[in-house]
Amino acid sequence: QRMCGFDKKLTECSYDELKHYRLAKSDEKIPLFDEVLKVIDGKVPLIVEVKSEGDWKKTTQLMAERMDSYRGCYCMESFHPFAVKWFKDHRPEIIRGQLSTNYFKDKINRKWYEKFLLSNLMLNFLTKPDFIAYNHLWKKDFSYTLCRKLFKPENVAWTIKNQKELEEAEKTFDVIIFDSFIPKKRS
């Protein structure tokens, strides 16, 4: 919905259906993953997110196979801890990131124990992510602060939507993931 304005899950659509939608009110269609990789062709580093909906294991394996022949630099991230663990076990040379948020405060529809485990990053001892990308709104959550101190991962904020949020996030986070604006250049 964010990029194309239709209210349907990507996993519910065929590519034949998706290619009729346009991205962000432009004339650009939704590209296949291989098309994106061909256009980028290693010119810039990539953050590749493995979505947690659907068959995370199959998606993770397919993404890894595609990226095996990619000539550029990339890291992977996912909200699904076992996708991160899969990369730890099968592609340990790839930088891995655990995406997370406070599932309770964000009112995400999950079972209470899933919210508890994911909000508190309780599987990080298994997945050992290189970085934690955490919702910047909840940067003071105890479990996030504790994980940063115990495991010393890179500290990443998502998703910053304006200059004011950026300036505030820079006080806490090492790396910023931003969307929907272009940050002002630093002097």
List the predicted regions and their residue ranges.
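Metal-dependent phosphodiesterase/phospholipase catalytic core, i.e.
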Residues: 1-104, 125-129, 133-137
